[in-house]
Amino acid sequence: HLLPQSSLWQGATLLGEIAWNRRLSITKNAAALDPNTTRDATAIRVVFEPQYFQVLDGVDISVPIGLGYTIDGRSGAVGAFGPEHGGDFSVGVKGDFMKVWRFSFGLTHYFGSAGPIAAGGIQTFKQIYRDRDFLSFAATRTF
């Protein structure tokens, strides 16, 4: 969704997604299903990105802010759906100079109860990236 100009930004976008899945039935080999999964699982992801134009001569920037969270359930239908009651938060700065040079800097933080992907052959649905927060930087040039 494009947001109109305000006193806090010159332009902005707001994106959102709700994901839900349900396992309807199991026709064969039901014993192979992980007993820690649930029939339903629900998650959300939201990204808000205010934009600022001509901050310096020829420089436009934006500040993407994102949040992903598994609201409910432990998906038996989608393998990497997310940790139960966990997710990630990210914030960054993106910019361009004269629409030729583009740069970005970001921080991603993972939250939720930490744990391994599986214990005793059963998925834990814990946050396996809890200790993997990271910074990223990229620069590109068009020609």
Regions found by a protein language model. Give the residues of each.
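Residues on the lipid-exposed face of transmembrane beta-strands in outer-membrane beta-barrel proteins
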Residues: 1, 46-52, 65-67, 91-95, ...
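Residues that define the transmembrane beta-barrel architecture of outer-membrane proteins
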Residues: 38-44, 83-89, 131-135
